[in-house]
Amino acid sequence: LIRIDVTKRNGLGQFGGRTRHLTLVGTAGNHQIDIANWGGDSFRRAFGLRSDWYRFPDFVAGGFWVAKTNGSVLALGSAVHYSDASSQTLGSPVAAMAVTPTGRGYWLVTVGGDVYAYGDAAYIGAMSGLALNAPIVGLAAHPDGNGYWLTASDGGVFAFGSAAFYGSMGDVALNKPVVGMEATSSGNGYWLVAADGGIFAFGDATFHGSTGHLRLNQPITSMTIAPGGGGYWFVAKDGGVFSFGNATFHGSRGNRTNRRPIAGMAVTTTGGGYWLVMDDGTSFPFGDAPDYVSNTAGPTVVAIDAVPLPPG
């Protein structure tokens, strides 16, 4: 036995609710256990467990960070906490975060354009003290770790360090505001996503599809690219997930009654799963995403980012 993954829960309660499917991963292959209800939980009965509300924290594979508007950062799984801005007096709330390519550091950016760097993340520049036409909503790191981009809700893009400017929507009237951005794996392009799921691709970023022509139940809150950059996911405020290109759909919260809005998502290093995270930090794993108790973060979570694959 290598590990045990909880691959489905009923979505009710702490760390995603009661267990409804397990994958036992072993050297000779995988074994699936489908669990219809408490009485039908063969795993629980075999080990004498008194509840079907369980998890396996000893099997740590991957992880993610969540950032809050006050600058605090919580690390889950294999993610490491490299300090944060919670002890500082911020000029404006934190809006986004980005992890360094090594996974040993991260940047935070505020809506006013201030940038804070931790771990092996280098401070390369910011929009501090400059008059912005619209608040900053997104941050994307260059793959070489020596630059980053900021984007504002009006589609304006600001490039620092090795990150080159490939265009923006700053001078275009948008149907809905931009809510996030992602960089291509080469660092020679980026995508912007709007609240209606409209996608704007620049440089070598490929357009794989969008929801800009659809009527969404709730606005998009963030996007995440698939490993290798051949696709991307959007997540909406109600937990709806939309996949494009080679990004695979592993499930969503779109058909559930959520007690809090979904703030964002993070994708596993394999691309075989993802976490959806509410604005109080509660996470819901899908696919091969491990299960973590992340609701200790508390309210005002605004950004989520996953531990990356090691360079090379």
Region locations from a protein language model:
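Trp/Gly-enriched beta-strand/coil motifs that build multi-repeat beta-propeller-like domains
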Residues: 60-312
